[in-house]
């Protein structure tokens, strides 16, 4: 049994931000995550057994990109650009309406990572010494003087995850009464032998029953590889959460139709995100229980849902808990 000041459950961006902020304030921090690697929905993987020349290449299958508005987050992003971790990607995406490309939409600069968005979280976590992956906390027990989760005891606990996941560890009365709802997404990766589609970075696909978004991962990564990632419509995805691969025929057909691709992909893969994103965000930066030493952070807070909101929320919660500890 280990003992620590702060147990951070969830090693996505908000969890890492919380841990870093608390550690910088002098707290002893332990981070645990059920996944094989840190990053959460900032998820990347290496392609394997595709039958193409692109095995070993990284693809993002979680968050597609991120933006930066807060001055502190902007400063961190600029530093990561200088270090080669992050690259400005684009400020313009195409729009597909009523069966045809209808123009482009320009907005804030979207940032990507040559090594995959997971490397952003890994970079920010470099100063954390106590990170434990493949650790599933089934129950967070309230004990005199703190909490216990699995083999870890702590004075405080930060749950950096979607609230429905936190509800599996704690009774409902120990969590905030919010009306936030989450929608699922199935991310479909398509690897082609050659790139034959229109030069673009991504496409917002409106009013389509199958897909809502297509990212050109070659443009995102900067190597121009013929790799696409399509996000399945949440309503369609909800019917296939137990069998994500079941969306592949329709998702492949829809992607080829939108981008006018004649050839079939050489390799495809579907990944389920049951809690992909909150439909709206809470303006509060985080939540602290009024009586118990626990709190919540993530991209449903700090005005989310955005990647930046996850970082802002986690940092704010980590600082608040460190202040309570000292």
Segments predicted by a language model, with ranges:
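Short beta-strand to alpha-helix junction loop
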Residues: 65-69, 94, 98-123, 241-250
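N-terminal FAD cofactor-binding segment of flavoenzymes
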Residues: 21, 43-93
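Glycine-rich FAD pyrophosphate-binding loop
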Residues: 7, 23-54
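Flavin (FAD/FMN) cofactor-binding core of flavoprotein oxidoreductases
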Residues: 249, 254-292, 302
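Active-site substrate-recognition segment that forms the wall
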Residues: 189-241, 250-259
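Central helical "cap/lid" subdomain
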Residues: 39, 55-56, 154-201, 261-263
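Short hydrophobic core segments
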Residues: 7-9, 32, 152-166, 314
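A conserved short coil-to-beta-strand element within the FAD-binding core of flavoproteins
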Residues: 133-147
């Amino acid at each position: 049994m280990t003992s620590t000041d702060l147990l951070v459950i969830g090693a996505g961006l908000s969890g890492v931000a919380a841990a870093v902020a608390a550690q910088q304030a002098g707290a002893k921090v332990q981070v645990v995550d059920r996944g094989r690697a840190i990053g959460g929905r900032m998820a990347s993987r290496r392609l394997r057994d595709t039958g193409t020349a692109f095995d070993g290449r990284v693809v993002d299958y979680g968050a597609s990109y991120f933006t930066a508005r807060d001055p502190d987050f902007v400063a961190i992003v600029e530093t990561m650009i200088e270090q080669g971790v992050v690259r400005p990607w684009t400020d313009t995406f195409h729009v597909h309406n009523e069966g045809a490309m209808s123009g482009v939409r320009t907005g804030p600069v979207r940032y990507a990572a040559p090594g995959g968005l997971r490397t952003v979280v890994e970079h920010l976590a470099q100063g954390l010494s106590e990170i434990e992956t493949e650790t599933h906390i089934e129950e967070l027990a309230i004990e005199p003087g703190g909490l216990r989760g699995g083999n870890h005891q702590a004075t405080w606990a930060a749950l950096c995850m979607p609230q429905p996941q936190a509800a599996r560890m704690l009774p409902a009365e120990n969590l905030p009464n919010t009306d936030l709802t989450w929608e699922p997404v199935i991310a479909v990766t398509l690897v082609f032998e050659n790139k034959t589609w229109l030069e673009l970075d991504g496409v917002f696909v409106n009013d389509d029953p199958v897909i809502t978004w297509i990212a050109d991962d070659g443009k995102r990564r900067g190597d121009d590889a013929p790799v696409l990632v399509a996000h399945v419509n949440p309503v369609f995805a909800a019917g296939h959460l137990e069998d994500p691969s079941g969306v592949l025929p329709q998702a492949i057909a829809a992607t080829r139709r939108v981008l006018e691709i004649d050839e079939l992909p050489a390799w495809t893969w579907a990944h389920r995100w049951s809690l992909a994103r909150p439909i709206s965000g809470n303006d509060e930066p985080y939540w602290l229980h009024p009586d118990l030493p626990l709190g919540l952070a993530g991209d449903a807070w700090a005005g989310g849902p955005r990647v930046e909101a996850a970082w802002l929320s986690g940092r704010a919660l980590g600082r608040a808990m460190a202040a309570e500890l000292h």
